[in-house]
Amino acid sequence: MQSPKIRIRLRAFDYRAIDRSSQEIVETAKRTGAKVHGPIPLPTRIEKFSVNRSVHVNKKSAEQFEIRTHKRLLDIVDPTARTIDELKKLNLPAGVDITIRI
């Protein structure tokens, strides 16, 4: 039989915030006695946009923007009830999106 596992996916535009958050999660899980695999960096999604600088003239003049979405994956193996309680209490930065699957 497979042991219970918590899979945590983190997404953010700022890689420093996502690295800090994943480090906090790892420290919390290890402190409560669970085993942690990760953080595993997943591929960064890059969206590029080109916008004309002017409305009517200078078609060749365009500005280019990009949005980078950084992702990390954490697996917590054999979590205890204390591990889950501590993860619920964890305060993460506003720019980090977290998805937890058990």
From Swiss-Prot:
Pfam families: Ribosomal_S10 (PF00338). Signal peptide: none annotated. GO terms for molecular function: structural constituent of ribosome; tRNA binding. Involved in the binding of tRNA to the ribosomes. Part of the 30S ribosomal subunit. Keywords: Ribonucleoprotein, Ribosomal protein. Belongs to the universal ribosomal protein uS10 family. Gene3D superfamilies: Ribosomal protein S10 domain. GO terms for biological process: translation. It comes from Akkermansia muciniphila (strain ATCC BAA-835 / DSM 22959 / JCM 33894 / BCRC 81048 / CCUG 64013 / CIP 107961 / Muc). GO terms for cellular component: ribonucleoprotein complex; ribosome. This is Small ribosomal subunit protein uS10.
